[in-house]
């Protein structure tokens, strides 16, 4: 659901991006959703939140990108292929009472996607040792489960040196030095 005020503004600013399109899996989406999804690929590949903004700055008009005419589109298509392969990686889900956990070592920022793909009725935490020095984790909670992801992750603050984290009821994230990762 798009908030009505935001939808009205989007329809006025770029109506062609508010038109329905078929997604790669056959589901319907708005053109803007596909555009935003592609822009987010840069962050997943390079770990920096600034990457999507740099990509946006390099595009003179959204039409070039949405119509697949911009050279950046081809690069993002390659990113998408690599990420699809990573999203399908074999994982082992460990069950720890109320929370499931997956441990991976991957240079890409895919924890949140793996949470969504493997969540099965209870909260799931994916911890990714993405280089020799750092671990980043993502916790997701099903909508129908009463569990506060942010409060759960806050319980680890001060117990693991260098851990930073937080979140809200349905999602949260943590990072900590890899030497703390057992």
Name each model feature, range by range.
Residues 4-9, 97-182:
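Glycine-rich, acidic loop segments that terminate in or are immediately followed by a histidine
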Residues 1-98, 103-109, 115-130:
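A structured phosphate/pyrophosphate-recognition subdomain
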